[in-house]
Swiss-Prot record:
Its main location: membrane. The gene is MAP1LC3A. Transmembrane segments: none annotated. GO terms for molecular function: microtubule binding; phosphatidylethanolamine binding; phospholipid binding; ubiquitin protein ligase binding. This is Microtubule-associated protein 1 light chain 3 alpha. It is a lipid-anchor. A lipid is attached at G120 (Phosphatidylserine amidated glycine). The keyword Phosphoprotein applies.
Amino acid sequence: MPSDRPFKQRRSFADRCKEVQQIREQHPSKIPVIIERYKGEKQLPVLDKTKFLVPDHVNMSELVKIIRRRLQLNPTQAFFLLVNQHSMVSVSTPIADIYEQEKDEDGFLYMVYASQETFGF
């Protein structure tokens, strides 16, 4: 079971940067993505892991399908995947494009998922 603390709080900035560098060297066609449950989410389960290596040709709709399957959601359950806790991106957008635009300074691409698209901002 993953920790309740966000990934950024569990690992130092230097460790995260080093890990991304190793991942990109060993898997140049994979995007390092951290996917965590939105902190206020109550309905959706917690993923069994938070770190994913996503092939760079995958688009957002494929990633959503993968995450829905991992969460074992039924087709009627609402599910929203947000980049950097704020951006809903087009499902046809390749993950490589999103990575270039939205990656964190540590090199990971951060996403959160929730059952509602309104987050009280």
